[in-house]
Structures are given as C-alpha cells and as structure tokens.
C-alpha cells in the first residue's frame, strides 16, 4: 500500500507501507465489536440506587390489612411506593467489561488502518520532533503539514512534542502500543513516523 510521505513543508512523496498492516479488507462487524468492547472496558461504575433494605423508612405497616378498601401494604420501602427502594438497583461494582481475544483485536486494528489508508487519511513522516515545548510551534508544524485533527503515532513520544500538543484540542500523540481503535477512527488524519510503522508491523503483522 502506497502512503503519502510528508516533509516539513507538507510536500508529499510516496512511501511503500506493508500490506500486512495497510492492505487488509475492511471487516465492519469486527471493528464494531472491538470499538464497543474498548468503550465498555473504559467504563467505571458510577451509578448507584438503593434497594428496599437501604432506603430510610419505617417498618411500621402503613394501615391495617383489611377493612379500609385500599390495597394491602406492608411497609413504605416497597418499590411500589414513591421514595421506596429500587427493585433491581444499579451498583457501582457493576462490571461492564467485554473480552476480546488478542488475535481479534489485532485484526481489528489492521482493518481500521487499512480502511484509513484507502480513504487517504494516513500519512507518514520520517520523525516528528520539536525544538522546544511550545504549543505555537506544534500548531505551526501541523499547519505546514496540512493537518488539524490528527492522531500522531510515533515510536518514542518526545517530551517537547507531548508538552506542546497536549493543549491542542484535536491532536493526540501516542506510541504504537497505545493506538486504540476509538482514537484511530475519531481523528480526521493519522500521522505515523517510519520507526512507528516498523513497530506496528512487529506488533500486528
């Protein structure tokens, strides 16, 4: 698969990328599965309701069992009552995780990268470094490359690059092992350094 190789001025040459990573068919069902699993595994239990044993209430019977004409009632903590406990409350310990086999996950990442390459959303650079940790420098460099919303995958995250890009809302910098399916899909472009492509091939090939 031929990808664009950009220089510092944004001029493009051709880079021959490995078909094992960028030449696969798009498997929509698999990509959907790994994205959903990734989002589910990132979830933390932060909802909670009380059941009928946990709500504050009296155990006194609201009215006598027979003779009032009203429906019988045992206590005000019943889920039928306003202010009563939930019948099936959510718990912070709820487990949302989904298991995805490593082989499937790697195949899904390859499928995403291949589709992005076909859509001309992947570009390659030799390296991505900055002289100092200035956001202005990072923004200017990305502008010269013709990039605004971009995921930068580099073999080694330079401290200057990390500090300079962390305040840019549509830019993320990661190493190949941290390139997750959601980020790959989310950003308009993916910029990969040559050494990072070698690492991706070793990880996913």
From Swiss-Prot:
Upper taxonomic lineage? Bacteria, Pseudomonadati, Pseudomonadota, Betaproteobacteria, Burkholderiales
- Of which family is this protein a member? Belongs to the universal ribosomal protein uL4 family.
Q: Which SUPFAM superfamilies match?
A: Ribosomal protein L4 (SSF52166)
Compositionally biased intervals (Basic residues): 58-69
* Known role: One of the primary rRNA binding proteins, this protein initially binds near the 5'-end of the 23S rRNA. It is important during the early stages of 50S assembly. It makes multiple contacts with different domains of the 23S rRNA in the assembled 50S subunit and ribosome.
Q: What is this protein called?
A: Large ribosomal subunit protein uL4
Q: Which InterPro entries would you find in this protein's record?
A: Ribosomal_uL4 (IPR002136), Ribosomal_uL4-like (IPR013005), Ribosomal_uL4_dom_sf (IPR023574)
Pfam families per record: Ribosomal_L4
Basic and acidic residues compositional bias: what residue ranges?
Answer: 48-57
Q: Which residues form a coiled coil?
A: none
Naming one, the record's GO cellular component terms include: ribonucleoprotein complex
GO BP terms in the entry: translation
Q: Which gene encodes it?
A: rplD
């Amino acid at each position: 698969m031929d990808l664009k190789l950009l220089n510092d001025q944004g001029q493009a040459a051709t880079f021959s990328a490995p078909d094992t990573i960028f030449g696969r068919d798009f498997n929509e069902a698999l990509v959907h599965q790994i994205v959903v699993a990734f989002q589910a595994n990132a979830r933390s239990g932060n909802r909670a309701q009380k059941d009928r044993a946990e709500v504050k209430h009296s155990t006194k019977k609201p009215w006598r069992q027979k003779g009032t004409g009203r429906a019988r009632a045992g206590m005000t903590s019943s889920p039928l009552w306003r202010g009563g406990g939930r019948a099936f409350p959510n718990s912070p310990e709820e487990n949302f995780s989904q298991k995805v086999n490593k082989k499937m996950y790697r195949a899904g990442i390859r499928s995403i990268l291949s589709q992005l390459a076909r859509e001309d959303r992947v570009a390659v650079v030799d390296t991505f470094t900055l002289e100092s940790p200035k956001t202005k420098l990072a923004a200017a460099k990305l502008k010269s490359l013709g990039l605004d919303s971009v995921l930068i995958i580099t073999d080694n995250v330079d401290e200057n690059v990390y500090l300079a890009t962390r305040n840019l809302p549509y830019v993320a910098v990661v190493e190949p092992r941290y390139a997750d399916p959601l980020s790959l899909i989310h950003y308009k472009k993916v910029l990969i350094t040559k050494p990072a492509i070698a690492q991706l091939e070793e990880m996913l090939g």
